[in-house]
Amino acid sequence: MMNEPSIRQAFADAERVDLALVGLGELTVGSSLVRCGYLTRVQLRELKDKGAVGEVLMSFYDARGAPVRASFHDRVVSIGLERVSRLPMVIAVAFGRSKLGAIRGALCGGFIQGLVTDRDTAERLLEGVPSRLGGKGNQGRARAGESQQG
């Protein structure tokens, strides 16, 4: 398949990308990968058993952002997590409680530099993060823009 000119050209073009807008996928039976048939429930179970929490461009990763290689890896056509992590700017789009693990893993892995999300997801991501690092610390979920007395 990699000998196909159009695929070869797409991969060559990917080498010149300096900004990527990507989605982060969660690994649940309700995920679009499973619903659309790109991933079977058996493959999903294999990934989860290996510690995978999310995916970007069909590249799977664990809670630390480390790649998780599945038995079907060689049948996936993707630029891969290694290449994604070398891109100068990767902005991820992900929101909702089901995506928290995928977002945290991507942030820990350092392969995204920006995140587009909703307020509730952002606040949940900041729970437990010390306030000196921009989090809410142990003060609970404050509304964005409200000052906290204490």
Language-model region placement:
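Conserved phosphate- and dinucleotide-binding cores of soluble alpha/beta proteins
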Residues: 1-137, 141, 150
